[in-house]
From Swiss-Prot:
Its cofactor is Mg(2+); Mn(2+). Mg(2+) 2 binds at residues 276, 278. Gene3D superfamilies: 3.40.50.20, ATP-grasp fold, A domain, ATP-grasp fold, B domain. ATP binds at residues 135-190. Pfam families: Dala_Dala_lig_C, Dala_Dala_lig_N. Its EC number is 6.3.2.4. GO terms for cellular component: cytoplasm. This is D-alanine--D-alanine ligase B. Keywords: ATP-binding, Cell shape, Cell wall biogenesis/degradation, Cytoplasm, Ligase, Magnesium, Manganese, Metal-binding, Nucleotide-binding, Peptidoglycan synthesis. The gene is ddlB. It catalyses: 2 D-alanine + ATP = D-alanyl-D-alanine + ADP + phosphate + H(+). Belongs to the D-alanine--D-alanine ligase family. It is an enzyme of class 6 (ligase). GO terms for molecular function: ATP binding; D-alanine-D-alanine ligase activity; metal ion binding. The lineage of its organism: Bacteria, Pseudomonadati, Pseudomonadota, Alphaproteobacteria, Hyphomicrobiales.
Length: 315
């Protein structure tokens, strides 16, 4: 999109945010940032804090485009996408199938691996079956299958004699199905895809945190983004290729972001492992995709305008 083109469209954009998942606060932050910037671009914007009446609200509102700033279940698992397909309202990001598939970490990993993407060893389990015995040799990671923003992620270290009790306790709020994945040491890297183009690779360096968890993602100053990442050119290109391959294999549209581990402790070439793909990457002031776009010379306003103009049904 050319600079200033949005001001000539006059499109009415409904920004969906909030919702009722565990990532509600993140979604509100993304939604407010996106709505404010789209208004500055000249779009007519309506902000919708999503509840169970969202379909009737959209029918009455009749927007030209829905900008989906929801995160977590209902917002990025194919549910709201199905509603928008039924209502025939063009929307941003991925469609029903890709959203549902990407939200399921285990199944998304199998599809990516079948396309040639290198993934970590893992197994799908019911959390109650983990019990007091390690399901695999530590270190390993226990992840809820259908959560984002690192909610419920537990790292089990080599010196822990038993799995953490919280996994099987009543305090666990992230569903019974979990993925147990071998822990991959090394650097946190991520790569966004915009349309059919892999963008820059970014290194995430949490400040004072063991890994890129909820706080290091969304607390200002809790992580540093190095973009472009300082890695060998062939490794850089390999990560871009893997991100684009996963994006295509899963059937993503618009913008996605793939996360990686790069273990270069023993050699510069190291080992690159794909962890997961995010079809609704954060758009908060501390989020990665806006930083990656900025490194490519694309402003936040230009990124959002491109996403609005890219919106469609049958995605």
């Amino acid at each position: 999109m050319r600079r200033g083109e949005a001001r000539m469209t006059g499109k009415h954009v409904a920004v969906l945010m909030g919702g009722f998942s565990s990532e509600r606060s993140v979604s509100l932050s993304s939604g407010v940032a996106c709505a404010t910037t789209l208004e500055e671009c000249g779009y007519r914007v309506t902000r919708i804090d999503v509840d169970r009446n969202v379909a009737s609200i959209l029918v009455e509102l009749k927007p030209d485009v829905v900008f989906n700033a929801l995160h977590g279940p209902f917002g990025e698992d194919g549910a709201i996408q199905g509603v928008l397909e039924y209502l025939q309202i063009p929307y941003t990001h991925s469609g029903v199938l890709a959203s549902a598939l990407a939200m399921d970490k285990d199944r998304a990993k199998k599809v990516a691996a079948a396309a040639g993407v290198v993934v970590a060893p893992s197994r799908l389990m019911n959390r109650f079956d983990i019990g007091s015995q390690h399901p695999m040799k530590p270190p390993y990671v226990v992840k809820p299958v259908r959560e984002g923003s690192s909610f419920g992620v537990v790292i089990v270290k080599e010196d822990q004699p038993h799995p953490p009790q919280v996994i099987g306790s009543a305090d666990w709020k992230y569903g019974d199905e979990v993925m147990v994945e071998g822990y991959i040491a090394g650097r946190e890297l991520t790569c966004a895809v915009m349309g059919d183009r892999a963008m820059d690779v970014c290194e995430i360096m949490p400040v004072g945190y063991q890994f890129y968890d909820y706080d290091s993602k969304y607390v200002a100053g809790a992580s540093t983004h190095v973009c472009p990442a300082k890695i060998l050119p062939n490794i850089y290109q390999k990560i871009q290729t893997m991100a684009l391959t996963a994006h295509r294999a899963i059937g993503c549209r618009g913008v996605s972001r793939s996360d990686f581990r790069f273990d270069d402790r023993f050699s510069e070439e190291g080992e690159v492992v794909w962890l997961e793909i995010n079809t609704q990457p954060g758009m908060t002031p501390t989020s990665l995709v806006p930083d990656i776009a900025k490194a490519a010379g694309i402003s936040f306003a230009e990124l959002l305008s491109w996403m609005v103009e890219d919106a469609s049904c049958l995605r």
